[in-house]
Amino acid sequence: MSQQIQTFSISAPGFFGLNTQDSPLDLNAGFALVATNCIIDQYGRIGSRKGWSRVNSSSGNLGANDVKVIHELVQADGTLTVLFAGNNKIFKLSSTNTVTELTYGGGGTAPTITASNWQCASLNGITYFFQSGHNPLIYDPAVSTTTYRRVSEKTGYAATVPDADICISAFGRLWAANTTSVNSTVYFSDLISGHVWSTGTAGSLNVNNVWVNGADQITGLAAHNGFLFIFGKRQILVYQGATAPSTMSISDTVEGIGCIARDSIQTTSTDVLFLSNSGVRSLMRTIQEKSAPERDLSKNVRNDLMGAVAGETLSNIKSVYSEREAFYLLVTPSIDTTWCFDTKAYLPDGAARVTTWDSITPKSFLSRRDGSLYIGKTGYIGYYNTYQDYDTSYRMLYYTNHADLGDQNVTSILKKLSAVVIGGTNQVVTFKWGFDFKTNYLSDNATIPSQGVYYYGIAEYGANATTISYYSDGVALQTLVVSASGTGKVVQTGYESDINGSALSIQKIEIQAKQGKLS
């Protein structure tokens, strides 16, 4: 007797993000083994990331060099200025997004700039630039909108500004650390005066004897909810009362975990995210309990991530938190991989839903005051806002985990694959399928037709059969079907498409198969 065709469904495929850490046979169907150039969209579907368009039309004196840092100065009157560095120079974007080089305006001999790995911080309408081995610099638009100077050349300068590699602006002052000669002292400026380092309420905090896990060095600083976080390589110190530095005190410590990359630290409304020696971590503040439990966001991709980090120059690792996009991005540039950690919702074990991007090639990031996301590129600043990488398509890939279709002792005979997709227009989706952990996939193509704007309710495919929302962007839904063939005990399917101007998400997958021989 002929076996009946059975249908196996995956609703909200890829909802849990990547999992390359655990055995693929033990994974929930919501995990992905490949999710390249993907995000988890606002409805919990695996979907295409956005691309980028150029903010500046020409490079000016930046030339074909990387934009290593981007910073936004927000002044009291609401004036916004985008500052950036590359080619051992400092630039700003004009009101028409023209690249304008800032020249030295201090009146003496111009400082020698040999790198562009600045950490920027703004205080009282002035942006400060700190970088190891360099004189700290300032851009003060109240004095000049076309020049920079040394901090030491500002009127009212007092004491010696530390030649630090780390600087943040918090609680109305600058905090700096890790000079060429001292790596265990935090220096803080006077209130509202980033050029005053000895009088008023300025001072320093030596933590050399405070480290609880042996000698360490400061690798980063962060501030949150009145607390100052001092990151070492293998430990973290948490100081309370940082609004009044003279009386602040140690509140908590985290041992065995620290920060290994200065520019991986990002503060959100509730967390401080950073790259540790074992992955991306989140310090969850519970102010009432004065505790700081840590959480491993990269648990499901830890080995892959840390393998990538091992081959990096740590100062080249950059990150950003985007409140609008609800993700934390971390780039490992040597392998051209951007790790996207979704922050809309975490998995039950505290891990984040992770996807990767492989062709956008960020050199730096900026999340602007208005929520827009800027990306440092070679010769340009990119704006994350379109579904092309500067007029070029990019390929989205999603592959399921390996799974038996009901009985691991029975061979499955594939008959048909279908995918419900939302978005896309006039583009090919390549279906791939393979058996028993082999990568010699079979494939077939289905085409999303040219389509206009429609409105669809998506409750039919919502998790737990509940209404998630309406796709208010008016993007059409299509069911794509291909005939499949081949047999195996364990099946994996994949879905690839070139993104070229239109968003694409996968809402549901169905696999039709017959049972074969018992083995």
Regions found by a protein language model. Name each.
Residues 1-100, 110-127, 256-271, 277-519:
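Beta-sheet repeat architectures centered on beta-propellers
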Residues 52-62, 100-110, 147-157, 204-211, ...:
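A short beta-strand motif characteristic of beta-propeller blades
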Residues 167-199, 204, 212-216:
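Solenoidal tandem-repeat scaffolds enriched in leucines and small polar residues
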